[in-house]
Amino acid sequence: MMWSNFFMQEEDRRRTAVGRRRAQEQQNLGLTPEREGKIKLGLLVAIVGATLAVLAVGTEFWVELNTYKTNGSAVCEAAHLGLWKVCIKRLWQADVPAGRETCGPAELPGEANCTYFKFFTTGENARIFQRTTKKEVNLAAAVIAVLGLTAMALGCLCVIMVLSKGAESLLRLGAVCFGLSGLLLFVSLEVFRHSVGALLQGVNPETPPAPRLAYEYSWSLGCGVGAGLILLLGGVCFLLLTLPSWPWRSLCPKWGGPTA
């Protein structure tokens, strides 16, 4: 009985020592429950931006190209494209809204022909409605978008390491990665906008003549804009968490507590 009590006391002492050591490590790392909650909230914001970014880059509804409706024809053509592929659809004019002068929107049911851009493999330009893409601009937009996704993934990894390993020094790096990813997405959107302008001007001097086109940006590009804004917001939030608390206490004594 005496030996059993002795072993039980030793086990309690060991557990107490382990608990104190873990608490000391947590205190040394600076990850208080309140701070950990703020980091998790910032990570949640960044995950929303990451989801929108992947959705934008992976879909092909960045811009819609619509031909004008013609009298005496039952069908009309519209196209929608993104960073990787283009889809040309033949739509029934009866399905097009009556007050609309152009064919579309591209979400209407119809016969679709989707192809990936060949300038990623063979280096050939694509032809859309007797117009030729400018592959250098399209390639630049796609590469910049991929770099943005890479920076976003590195930012997520840094924040996860902060939460799991307590490596709080990586929080600043994560903030920079998220901010950089948001900026790269905006640059990719701007480069893509220039590629659309180059496509509309790249008319081939061939017969039959190229049809008149109207264009409108679609929901994939909207997701990209939202992703860039949210990722920038996440980067700013993480950057604020890396700043020391004493400047905020001096600027806002009511919020930061009493100052001596």
From Swiss-Prot:
Q: What does the entry list under GO cellular component?
A: L-type voltage-gated calcium channel complex
Expression by tissue, per the entry, reads: Detected in brain and heart (at protein level).
Which domain of life does the protein's organism represent?
A: Eukaryota
Q: Return one GO MF term.
A: calcium channel activity
TM region(s), chain numbering: 43-63, 143-163, 169-189, 221-241
Task: Please give the InterPro entries that the UniProt record associates with this protein.
Answer: PMP22/EMP/MP20/Claudin (IPR004031), VDCC_g6su (IPR008370), VDCC_gsu (IPR008368)
Q: Which keywords are on file for this protein?
A: Calcium, Calcium channel, Calcium transport, Cell membrane, Ion channel, Ion transport, Membrane, Transmembrane, Transmembrane helix, Transport, Voltage-gated channel
**Sections of the chain in a coiled coil:** none
* Membrane topology summary: Multi-pass membrane protein
State its location(s): Cell membrane
The record describes the protein's role as: Regulates the activity of L-type calcium channels that contain CACNA1C as pore-forming subunit.
Question: Assembly and partners?
Answer: Interacts with CACNA1C. Identified in a complex with the L-type calcium channel subunits CACNA1C, CACNA2D1 and either CACNB1 or CACNB2.
UniProt family annotation: Belongs to the PMP-22/EMP/MP20 family. CACNG subfamily.
Please report the name of this protein according to its UniProt entry: Voltage-dependent calcium channel gamma-6 subunit
